[in-house]
Amino acid sequence: MSKIIGIDLGTTNSCVAVMEGGEPKVIPNPEGNRTTPSVVAFKNEERQVGEVAKRQAITNPNTIMSVKRHMGTDYKVEVEGKDFTPQEISAIILQNLKASAEAYLGETVTKAVITVPAYFNDAERQATKDAGRIAGLEVERIINEPTAAALAYGLEKQDEEQKILVYDLGGGTFDVSILELADGTFEVISTAGDNRLGGDDFDQVIIDHLVAEFKKENSIDLSQDKMALQRLKDAAEKAKKDLSGVTQTQISLPFISAGAAGPLHLELTLTRAKFEEISAGLVERTLEPTRRALKDAGFAPSELDKVILVGGSTRIPAVQEAIKRETGKEPYKGVNPDEVVALGAAVQGGVLTGDVEGVLLLDVTPLSLGIETMGGVFTKLIERNTTIPTSKSQVFSTAADNQPAVDIHVLQGERPMSADNKTLGRFQLTDLPPAPRGIPQIEVTFDIDANGIVNVRAKDLGTSKEQTITIQSSSGLSDEEVDRMVQEAESNADADQKRKEEVELRNEADQLVFQTDKVVKDLEGKVDAAEVAKATEAKEALQAAIEKNELEEIRVKKDALQEIVQQLTVKLYEQAQAAAGQAEGAQGAQDAGAKKDNVVDAEFEEVKEDK
C-alpha cells in the first residue's frame, strides 16, 4: 500500500512527516528546513510558498499569511484580479508539502492525514478536507492536533497507563485536550480551546506597543503604513523569539518613516518583563479552556501524569510558567513542539496502512450538536466531548396543525439559544400528511464520522419519507467548485514546473557561456583558430537567445554549443595527456642518463674455496 503522509497544516508554519522503518520521520523541504512557513505569495502569476514568500512580504502586497484563521468562512482574498478562497491558498501550501514528500520518498504521494485544531467546527474541518482534495490528496483522516501530539508522544509508551494534558498554543489557534493512554488505546476524554488565540496575537501586542511608543515620540501612526507594519511584524516575531532565551532584546528599524526633519528610525529595547506585562491577558485566556477541559474530564490537576507542550508559542517562558502554576506539573520537554503534531499525523497514517499495529485512537467532538426547536431553543442531540464516530437520534413533532413541512436548522455550540450558536446548515422535510400539531413523528439522526464531519437525517416515521444532508456550511464548496479548483491547481502546478524548468534552462545556458569562455581562453594558440572562432560564434548566438528570452531557441543553441565545447574539451584533454607523456619521456631519458653517469668500475677477484 502506498505511503500516507502526515501533515500539520499550521497557521504560521506547516510540517510533513511519514512512517519509515516503524518510526515517524519529518521530511525536510528543499531548503533543508523541517518546517515551512504557511505563506503564499503571487508575483507576475508565479506562486511562491514558504520561506521565499515570507522573505519578500515587506515589498510584495500579494503575500498571504495566516489564512488558516479564515478556514470555514466566506472570506476571499483578491490577488492580481482573481479571488482566492482560504481552501485554495491552503491547497497551494499542501501542494508544496506534497512535492517535498514526493522528492524525499521518490514516489507519487496521493494520500494524507491532515491535522486541525481540536476546537475546529464542522465547517472548518470540511474546508480543510476540501483544501486537501484541491491539492490532489485523498484526505484519509482529519485528526485533532493535540491528539496527534499525544500519538507521537505515546507511541513508545503504549504499555504505560497515563493521564495526559496536551496544551497546544500554535501560531493562530489554541487547544487543550485531556487523554488517557492504556494498552495502545489513546482515548480523548475532553477538549477545549480558542480558535482566535495564538502566536500571531503575541506578535500583535508587541506591534501595538511599538506603534504606541513611536507615536508618543514622533506623533506618527505607523499602523497606517502597510510597509512599515510588515517590518514591525517581522521585528515583533523576532523579538518574541529572542525573549524566550534572553531577558531583553534590541529592536532596530532604520528609516521606518519620515518626518518634517527627514528620515525617522525606530530604536527600542524590549525587556522580557515588559513583554510579559503586555501579553498577560493572552496567557490568562489560555487558562480558562484548560480549567474547562479538566472539569469536563472530571480530573483534578494532581491526577495528571504528564503535561505536554505543543506549538512554537509554548516556548514563551510566561506560558510555561502559567501552565506549571495551573497544573502543578513541570511541562514535559521531550518532544519538539514544532514537529510533534506532524509526527503524530504520520503515526495515524501508519495505523491506517497497517504499518503501525496495536494502536487505537478514540477522539471526541469538541462542540455540542443539535437543532433549533420551538421558541428558538437549541436542543442538543450530541453533547460535546462525545467519542466519535457516533450516532444519536431523537423524535420531534410539528408546532402547528396541518404543517406541510419542517425546517431542520442544524447548529453547533454550547449556548442555550439557537441564535448564539454556529449554524452548520438547514434543510427541509416536506410533504408531511395533514395532522394536528404534535401528532407527526419526525426522527432526527445525527452521525459524526471519524473526521468529526456531520451528517444529519430527518425521517417521517409515519410515511418513512426521509431527507439526508451532509453539512455544507455557507462557506462550503460544492463538488463542482472543488473539481474546478483541483483542475486549476493541477494546471498551476504544471505551470510552476514549466517555470522551474525554464529557470533551470537559463541557468544551464549561462553556465555554458561561462564554461565556453574558460575553454576558449585555455585553448588560445593550441588549436586551429577556426575552431575557436566557431565556438565563439556559437556562444554569441546563445547569448543573443538568452537576451531575447526565446526558450526554444535557447535550448537549440545550448545543445549546439554544448557539442562544440565537448569536442574542444576532448582536444584540451588530449593535449594535456600528450604533454604529460612528453614530460614523462623526457624525465625517463634524464633518469637513464643520470644512471649512466653514476656507473662505478670495480675490480673483483674470484675466491675459490678449498674443498
Curated annotation (Swiss-Prot):
Entry's transmembrane regions: none
GO terms, molecular function: ATP binding; ATP-dependent protein folding chaperone; unfolded protein binding
Compositional bias per record (Acidic residues), positions renumbered to this chain: 600-611
Taxonomic superkingdom: Bacteria
Keywords: ATP-binding, Chaperone, Nucleotide-binding, Phosphoprotein, Stress response
Modified residues (Phosphothreonine): T173
Stretches for region Disordered: 579-611
InterPro entries linked: ATPase_NBD, Chaperone_DnaK, Heat_shock_70_CS, HSP70_C_sf, HSP70_peptide-bd_sf, Hsp_70_fam
Protein family membership: Belongs to the heat shock protein 70 family.
Known function: Acts as a chaperone.
Name of the protein described by the UniProt record: Chaperone protein DnaK
